[in-house]
Amino acid sequence: MRIINLIVVHCTATQGNRTLSPEALDLMHRRRGFNGTGYHYYIRKDGTVHLTRPVERIGAHAKGFNASSIGICYEGGLDCRGRPADTRTPEQRATLRLLIHQLLEDRKSTRLN
């Protein structure tokens, strides 16, 4: 079991009025030279959470911190004009809160960033 001491939350940096399937996210990462999705969890707008990389496999989401972190990504992050915005839906917020709580319970020495 690898030592996890950090949870990093990301967004897909896609417009909030567009959708991005887990498969499309995986393809985006592969086109950038990664071996699949770099995040461990992906939260869709409806609050559905997808395991996109096993937690025991080192992520590719936060250079310099991948070996000791878990990456969570939510769909969205840009407004309809492409500017950074908090586009999280109530469902995404609830799922994110629950997922982080579960991860922190499982790994008492982990911090959120």
Walk through the language-model features, giving the residues of each.
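Single conserved hydrophobic/aromatic residue that forms the stacking wall/gate
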Residues: 112-113
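Active-site-adjacent loop/helix surface patches within enzyme catalytic domains
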Residues: 2-109
